[in-house]
């Protein structure tokens, strides 16, 4: 599976176990539960072979389970390596209760690049299925070995086919998203359609699982219901994210600038600054100092004026006390508000300086002002 923000509660408390091609590799505590269950199931099946005795079936069951999850990791690496080739950072690969997850920093730039990333995982699983099938049919192996190879081959086939279901958050949903994106030219429409299809499959899985538990259908179990719930939750999350993105893309950074941002002109003396901007005025403790051309010159903290005797305030100007803000990140006033919000989140910033293309300061922007902008537009 692929994700920009997938996982929810299942992705908490991950344990880092190393790196793969420079990609951080994690396992979620829920993975150990499924590892134990799979080992138990495979061990019981292998214990039926008379050639295997004692603890051998259980050791082979554990090895088979680990090879199964190695197949899942290979599937996720397929996504990840194609994404890396497109210059997209892969933040992590995680094994968890429902399989594996490759977490990408951002979307691909084009529909066909998105298609390539999405299809790479199932393609790897299909290649593994073909390779294991050839090994199992062409190379003489003990019967238990043939059973293990055959099982791994079929699991990889099932992994590919299940992930090709055309609904988010599955790979098939990302394939559908890229196709709709290519046809309509609208990425959000692709996400919304693939999310709705994913929700439909989620409800279908829940229905099948419920009917199976009631013995109305010969298939379906509690596990089917759990998978359906997972699909519903994450498809719904994808749809909501797409709607928020669509709303935010209608605005620019300038639209979300804080009204009356703390901007003061160079040449202002400390007495004027204190009277007009500080004493009984605003809660700001840091001000942007701009020149006659409205370009940023520096930043003045209110704490700095305490070092100047009050008798000297009329003679000392703010630009003589200011410091240049080396760490302040700027964005273009015309930049999409969605891109700006992503920058705030990715770099863990509290605020951004918004400037015109010519460099003129517009004001400050922060998460609260983005939320207020969206709420005002929705009212």
Curated annotation (Swiss-Prot):
- Main EC class of this protein? hydrolase
Q: Can the keyword Cytoplasm be found in this entry's annotation?
A: no
To which protein family does this belong? Belongs to the peptidase M50B family.
The record's PANTHER family line, in alphabetical order, gives:
MEMBRANE-ASSOCIATED ZINC METALLOPROTEASE M50B, STAGE IV SPORULATION PROTEIN FB
Q: Which GO terms describe its molecular function?
A: metal ion binding; metallopeptidase activity
Give the required cofactors: Zn(2+)
Instruction: Give one Pfam family.
Output: Peptidase_M50
Q: Which stretches are transmembrane?
A: 20-40, 54-74, 115-135, 148-168, 212-232
Protein's UniProt name = Putative zinc metalloprotease sll0528
Keyword terms of this UniProt record: CBS domain, Cell membrane, Hydrolase, Membrane, Metal-binding, Metalloprotease, Protease, Repeat, Transmembrane, Transmembrane helix, Zinc
